[in-house]
Amino acid sequence: MPECEAYLSGRYEPHLGKEDINDMNSARRFDASQGPRIIGPRDGKLVDLGPVGVRFLVWGEESGGGFSLVEHPIPPRHLAAPLHRHSREDEYSYVLEGRMGALLGEDVVYAEAGDLAFKPRDQWHTFWNAGDTPCRILEIISPAGFERYFEELAMGVGSADEYQRRYGTEADFESIQRLCAEYGLRFPPIV
């Protein structure tokens, strides 16, 4: 999915792929030690992971390890991730635009622009674009560290088992087909 449909039609230009993800440290980053600062709508780096994009805004080392902040652009009717849970992090998803569907434990919920969904650690969850227009969410991950999962996934190094062990996650990959059928979603393979 080229640059998540050019950053969901905003014609986003920056690209970060396997070949240049190691240049992340040279990218302009937020640094709390530099004092107050604005992170603009085109700052950060967008990584195209197939079904969902990741725009890195605040890294853990920039927040003293307290949190990381990423933006996920999700194309219409796409599942963002298999059913999964984290053993270390809580996640907060703030819907910027569109309609996000989420399975939180046993509950299916829907969040519109301006809504915040809380996904506590150890709870099975997944999320998707539940609409026919682009969806964008800001994801606050606390404590920080899990943003490195996206970085490594984009580099294409390691196996799913390795990632899950390293980042303290579990994923139910068999849930993908069921979730797509139940909610009319697509989930292209990550390349």
Where do the PLM segments sit?
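Ligand-binding loop in jelly-roll beta-barrel domains
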Residues: 65, 121-147
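Acidic/histidine-enriched, glycine/proline-rich intrinsically disordered or flexible terminal extensions
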Residues: 152-191
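Intrinsically disordered, low-complexity segments enriched in serine/proline and basic residues
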Residues: 2-6, 14-16
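Short, conserved beta-strand element in jelly-roll/cupin
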Residues: 71-75, 85-104, 140-141
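A short glycine-rich, His/Asp/Glu-containing loop-to-beta-strand
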Residues: 43-83, 89-90
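Short acidic-glycine-tyrosine-enriched beta hairpin
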Residues: 106-124
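Structural motif
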Residues: 53, 92, 99-101, 108, ...
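Extreme N-terminal tail/first-helix region
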Residues: 17, 23-56
